């Protein structure tokens, strides 16, 4: 899976899980500040990313993923 495909899939997951429009999402979007995620939303999002991409994201790594681009980069580096 290419980085572009991963980005598209991450965006789709964010739209599905967080109820935002795709045009509201940028690589710099912060899950909490810009997209309105609370801590439960963030946990659910991380779990969905793990399921979708077949990666394990330890809690200490998940805490460092605060933006859309950080999530994409993490998955690209794990694939």
Curated annotation (Swiss-Prot):
Gene3D superfamilies: ACP-like
SUPFAM superfamilies the UniProt entry points to: ACP-like (SSF47336)
GO biological process: lipid A biosynthetic process
Pathway assigned to this chain's UniProt record: Lipid metabolism; fatty acid biosynthesis
Post-translational modification: 4'-phosphopantetheine is transferred from CoA to a specific serine of apo-ACP by AcpS. This modification is essential for activity because fatty acids are bound in thioester linkage to the sulfhydryl of the prosthetic group.
Keywords: Cytoplasm, Fatty acid biosynthesis, Fatty acid metabolism, Lipid biosynthesis, Lipid metabolism, Phosphopantetheine, Phosphoprotein
UniProt GO cellular component terms: cytosol; membrane
Record's signal peptide: none
UniProt keyword Lipid biosynthesis, yes or no: yes
One Pfam family this sequence matches: PP-binding
Location relative to the cell: Cytoplasm
Molecular function via GO: acyl binding; acyl carrier activity
Every Carrier domain range: 4-79
TM spans (from-to): none
Sites of O-(pantetheine 4'-phosphoryl)serine modification: 39
Main function: Carrier of the growing fatty acid chain in fatty acid biosynthesis.
Family from the record: Belongs to the acyl carrier protein (ACP) family.
Record's protein name: Acyl carrier protein
Species, as recorded: Chlorobaculum parvum (strain DSM 263 / NCIMB 8327)
